Amino acid sequence: MIAKIIDGKYVSEKIKQEIAKQVRKNMNSGKRAPGLAMILVGHNPISQIYVTNKKKACEQVGLISFLYTLPITATENEIFQLIETLNNDNRIDGILIQLPLPNKLNKINVLEHIAPDKDVDGFHPYNVGRLCQRSPTLRPCTSRGIITLLEWYNIDMFVLHAVVVGASNIVGRPMTMELLLAGCTVSVTHRFTQNLKIYIENADLLIVAVGQANFIPGSWIKQGAIVIDVGINRLNNGNIVGDVHFSSAYERAAYITPVPGGVGPMTVVTLIQNTLQAYDDHHLVR
């Protein structure tokens, strides 16, 4: 069996076109453009690349982005003050904190200061709780983007045995909630799960997010499985690979996401979708 590629780059571009059309329609009716505020603390080069990509995506669809760069010496109180200003700024529909933060800062405290209706990353406890209660509002971007991809390819998730490898707050945990909403039977594992191979061999849908290059060998993949690889890892030779050994998994899976070009573009476009959703809600209540 040769897998069909789930092309996140293609799907994300199609979604951007629809968002741009909606933004133009809103502005032609006299409304302002949606606004996204991004807060970058320190000078992490990888974080700077991610912020640049998000700014570019905003420009492509007509959103206005506001970048606030704080020094690595910034205190939590200084960040709280900035967030409070943005919470009360009617030009701003979405606020994101570019992660990771410097170690001295308490990530949970910082994220909790964002108004839940502007939390377009979907990490505020209120939004996570809504997802857990089966009534999501602003949903975490990567997990929502994966669901969008699967739906785009008309993959019926109902009653599939889904195995999630990785239990982070950013991917694994919200992904589990999304899969339960879709009607999957879900097994949640991580890098240190005993007999991990057995779980993966029985997975109809496998979602891997551990941040370790080629961690899952293709020989573990069930014939005809759907493989979603969230990992993005740079090898010593400069090549970018995922958490699943692609070439061998490609020969066994029915569907598979490439790295790069699979989940990554969907995370960014989902951030834009969430910002437009927050914008629509802003105008609805006013």
UniProtKB/Swiss-Prot annotation:
An annotated GO BP: purine nucleotide biosynthetic process
Annotated GO MF terms: methenyltetrahydrofolate cyclohydrolase activity; methylenetetrahydrofolate dehydrogenase (NADP+) activity
Role this protein plays: Catalyzes the oxidation of 5,10-methylenetetrahydrofolate to 5,10-methenyltetrahydrofolate and then the hydrolysis of 5,10-methenyltetrahydrofolate to 10-formyltetrahydrofolate.
Protein name, UniProt field: Bifunctional protein FolD
Sequence positions that bind NADP(+): G166, A167, S168, I232
Organism classification: Bacteria, Pseudomonadati, Pseudomonadota, Gammaproteobacteria, Enterobacterales
Catalytic activity line of the entry: (6R)-5,10-methylene-5,6,7,8-tetrahydrofolate + NADP(+) = (6R)-5,10-methenyltetrahydrofolate + NADPH; (6R)-5,10-methenyltetrahydrofolate + H2O = (6R)-10-formyltetrahydrofolate + H(+)
GO cellular component: cytosol
Disulfide feature: none
Keyword list, A-Z: Amino-acid biosynthesis, Histidine biosynthesis, Hydrolase, Methionine biosynthesis, Multifunctional enzyme, NADP, One-carbon metabolism, Oxidoreductase, Purine biosynthesis
